[in-house]
């Protein structure tokens, strides 16, 4: 099996266009939004996130994808043996695709903190995907000030210092507009730092994977 060097954006596109398929034996998508948040935090910091194991070729025994896919093109598919959770998460966030998990189809909405600390802050809470967004909102807002990524909540989504990650990757929101919304100007040390951070965030698309 030959080695392929791909990027996070390549994997997301391959998942969305149907050229990466799941063998029937693979379990479905099970990651919570909090797991996706942790993946993107690792990508942002350049941490290792593993390899993607595939088998080149077609199979009639494939599982339905957790995201919407067209009919795969003949002769252009890979069977995804290991890495399904990561690849589906990449497609969901980088392309803004909805995912089917726990019998529900919904987007995975992450927010990026323009004012995050440079150091990693130890986790002292976890978002519960099954709770209503308004529940414990005050506690979450206070606890997330030191975080880089969080699962979106209603109150944080209304704060311009927290940027919707999928909107940034799908170009629904430009970095300069996001910074202007947050600081009212592009001409300040805070604005310069925020622009640098958003460019670093967008560089996740070029994160290298071995497949």
Q: PLM features: residue spans?
A:
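Basic- and aromatic-enriched surface patches that contact anionic nucleotides/nucleic acids
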Residues: 1-211
């Amino acid at each position: 099996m030959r080695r392929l060097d791909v990027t996070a954006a390549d994997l997301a596109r391959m998942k969305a266009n149907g050229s990466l398929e799941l063998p029937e034996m693979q379990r479905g998508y099970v990651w919570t939004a909090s797991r996706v948040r942790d993946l993107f935090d690792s990508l942002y910091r350049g941490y290792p996130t593993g390899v993607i194991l595939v088998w080149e070729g077609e199979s009639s025994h494939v599982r339905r994808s957790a995201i919407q896919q067209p009919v795969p093109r003949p002769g252009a598919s890979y069977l995804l043996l290991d890495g399904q959770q990561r690849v589906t998460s990449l497609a969901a966030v980088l392309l803004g695709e909805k995912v089917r998990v726990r019998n529900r189809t919904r987007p995975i909405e992450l927010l990026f903190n323009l004012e995050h600390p440079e150091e990693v802050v130890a986790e002292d809470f976890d978002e519960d995907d099954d709770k209503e967004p308004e529940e414990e909102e005050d506690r979450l807002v206070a606890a997330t000030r030191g975080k880089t990524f969080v699962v979106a909540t209603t109150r944080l989504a209304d704060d311009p210092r927290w940027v919707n990650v999928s909107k940034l990757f799908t170009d629904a929101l430009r970095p300069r507009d996001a910074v202007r919304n947050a600081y009212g100007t592009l001409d300040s040390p805070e604005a310069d730092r925020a622009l640098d951070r958003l460019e670093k965030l967008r560089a996740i698309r070029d994160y290298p994977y071995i497949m």
